[in-house]
C-alpha cells in the first residue's frame, strides 16, 4: 500500500514535469495535417491513441510512437509535437497510450500496444496507410517498449512467449526504429544513478531491489530485457541519447550490439539544451532539430527507399 502511494506521488510530480515539457515543445498543428484524437482501442480509459496525417489520398508509411514516463506515468499528448514532424513529412503518425505500472505488469503493456496497432491496421485502407512500411519510435520507457515491438515482429515466437494475441502477427514487420534515451537491460540498469530507477522497475516487475539482487536465474532478467531480442534480423535503427543523461551508456551499449550484429544504424548524441534525459524529442532546440533531420534522412534510406544519403552527423 505504501509503495502504491509513493508511486502516485511520483506520478503526480512526473505529470507536472510533463506538462512543463509540453508547454516548451508547443507548436500549432501544421497546415495540411489532420488530427484524430482519443481513438479508442479498448474500453479502459487509458486505451486511446491519436493519429496525425495528411489527408491527401497518398499511401503513407506508418510511424508508431510510444511515450515514456518510467513505466508509471506519461501521456501521448506530450509527444504530439514530435509526431507532427513525421506527419508533415508524409507519415501517418500514431501516438499510443497504455496502462501504467504497478497496475499493469510486464508484458501487459506490450499486449496493449499491439492491440492498439491492430485496431489501426484494421483501418489502414481508410487512412491510406502502407502497412509494409512501419517505423516504431519512443523515448525512455517508450524506447524500451519500441524495442520489444520491433524485435517481436522479427522473432515471431515471442508473440506466444508474451501471450500477445495479434491478428497481423504473420505479416507485421517493423522497417526501422527510432530509440531515444532508452533502457534495454534490467539487471545492469538497476545500478545506474538515475532518479527512482529501482522504484520504476519494482513497479514493472513486482519485485523490490533487494529481491532482485537475490535472483540468480538469468531467465528472470531476460524476460525484462529487450536487448535479448536484438540480433541480425533487427530493423535498421536510429539511436539517440542525451549527452548528460545517466542512461546514455544504455544507448551506447545498444549501438555496439547493432554494430556487432551488422544491423544498419545511426547513433546521434544530443547536446546543448537537448542533453538531458528525453529532451531530444524537443525539436525546437538545436540538437533536437538536428537529430530529427538526421533521423529523417536515415528513414528515407531504409523505409522510403530514397536515394542513399550520408549517415554521418
Summary of predicted features, one role per range:
Residues 1-313:
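Alpha/beta-hydrolase superfamily serine-hydrolase fold, recognizing
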